[in-house]
Amino acid sequence: MRDILLTLILAGLLPVSLRRPFIGALVFAVISLANPHRLTWGFAYDQPWAQMYALATLAGILFTRERIVGDSIRRYLPVLVYLAWMGVTTAYAFDHPSAMFRWQQIIKVHLMCLVTLMLLSDWKRVKQLVWVAVCSIGFYGLKGGIFTITTGGEFRVWGPQSSAIEDNN
């Protein structure tokens, strides 16, 4: 049941993100931070939802008429310098194959961060993105808090499997 509900919601929002790329960026943030598909048990568990929304958002940017903030390199310079430095350090890593694998994963996320930064055209959108991040991470804080209280702190609280917040740190 969770699979069907999540698939209907995410599949229904995909065309919306083609018309309004900022919605796609918000859904990408939810998928990246909350990993809702990892709370399912069936076919939706391993679907590449983040990839679908990244592609839909990028396609939406190509065809949108809304204002995209790309006028000044100063806005993106810190992120671009950081990405360049990550590339340099990855090239000289001791365990190069492992470092390249991780770099390929992380560069995709940072690409979407740049895309989201381009779509933050006003203060309202910044607030929306902050609330999406707060609610996505706060969900697991609330869920973990309730679990800890009901079990008396006997077990560890883990995040969703194969996610950035999987471990206990």
Positions of the model-derived regions?
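Short amphipathic alpha-helical "recognition" segments used for binding
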Residues: 55, 108-112, 147
